[in-house]
Amino acid sequence: MQLHGKMTATAKSCALDFLDFVNASPTPYHAVQNLAEHYMSHGFQYLSEKSDWQSKIEPGNSYFVTRNKSSIIAFSIGKKWKPGNGFSIIATHTDSPTLRLKPKSQKSAYGYLQVGVEKYGGGIWHTWFDRDLSLAGRVMVEEEDGRVIQYNVHIDRPLLRIPTLAIHLDPSANSSFSFNMETEFVPLIGLENELAKEETSDNGDKYHHPVLLSLLANEISKSLETTIDPSKIVDFELILGDAEKARLGGIHEEFVFSPRLDNLGMTFCASQALTKSLENNSLDNESCVRVVPSFDHEEIGSVSAQGAESTFLPAVLQRICELGKESSLFSISMVKSFLVSADMAHAMHPNYSSRYENSNTPFLNKGTVIKVNANQRYTTNSAGIVLLKKVAQLADVPIQSFVVRNDSPCGSTIGPKLAAMTGMRTLDLGNPMLSMHSCREMCGSKDFEYAVVLFSSFFQNFANLEEKIIIDE
């Protein structure tokens, strides 16, 4: 299905589906909610970590489980699977570099209402200046019966802005723009007025602007078709985002311009591939379990209850293996499994070509990229490359390779962490992109379909291919 020239209808449809997903997923909480809805629409059943699964899961069916509502694991059990057989896994993450409201966010200066924010992850922070910014996250509301319920909120309009200083007051701005993250990187949300002063006096909230709490309460009230009092908001986790929608760009719509490509791009492709792989009753002859974990907190190290270094994935795989009676079967399943760490990759930047290794440089719309690093910043090895090349050949999609220069630092992914924790064979890959960790990034519009088809082929062919690549007998 290799594509040449302009996009095919199916490639464009896949790219447009991604736009819908990323525009509806301003936070990990929204992403997980949308993933759950996608899985349920394809017959997946929800499982609670707090319940016993022994009587609930069985071969031939599909399930998903969430943790903290910001990480999710979906899996489909082949009808021929038995404890001791392997898992085919494509792991992604749901978070992106962003700005998060501080526990006490209320600020004001010279008649402006401001909010205090804390940086999350390694963003290119200067790209957040002079952008229309929205606000989204989860809000904890106390109900009349005393329960505290999470509501996802998205103020889907330009609400905040971090303005730059006029060049007349900073003549060096074009040659050496720099700023203090604490004092010169404070978003504006409005102007002080009599209404704001009155609400502050009535509410007495010293943590957040009362007008902000009222805005959140109104947003929740609209979704519930009832009235929520701002005083019932107990706490929240809110982050800023680019208010401009993701969209197609370029002369032939060959680009996608979007926030959060890293890593909702791969999260979208993996989830689509899992459900696509189930077509034509493919689980009937499947001897493995197909798994897509999407973790929170990758951008800050993955060390949390819902991050990739948590018990989440090992616990889920262990519970699936407990369908058998022998405790040793879990360890056997691990060594028979293969994990693909799917995280976006660096495409060639035409204005900075000297920063790239000449022979292993990916390009947009040329296929998914296998990432290699001798120092195990990426976990790819020759056995994994052989497997992915065969998977790509069966799917008739192109793949590329990426290696950093010897005089350049190298990023990493959840791949090495999961490989070390589980002992599973692991490979790192991702679709190529530009402006990684910017407030707004870009990638190729054809590469979404390439990745979905590649990942679906991996799920459908892993069991047969795994037996033919002999390493440890």
Swiss-Prot record:
Binds 2 Zn(2+) ions per subunit. Its cofactor is Zn(2+). GO terms for molecular function: aminopeptidase activity; metalloaminopeptidase activity; metallopeptidase activity; zinc ion binding. Zn(2+) 2 binds at residues 262, 299, 437. Zn(2+) 1 binds at residues 93, 262, 298-299, 343. Keywords: Aminopeptidase, Chaperone, Cytoplasm, Hydrolase, Metal-binding, Metalloprotease, Protease, Vacuole, Zinc. InterPro entries: Peptidase_M18, Peptidase_M18_dom2. It is found in: Cytoplasm; Vacuole lumen. Substrate binds at residues 168, 298, 343, 346, 371, 378. Its EC number is 3.4.11.21. It catalyses: Release of an N-terminal aspartate or glutamate from a peptide, with a preference for aspartate. SUPFAM superfamilies: Aminopeptidase/glucanase lid domain, Zn-dependent exopeptidases. Belongs to the peptidase M18 family. This is Aspartyl aminopeptidase 1.
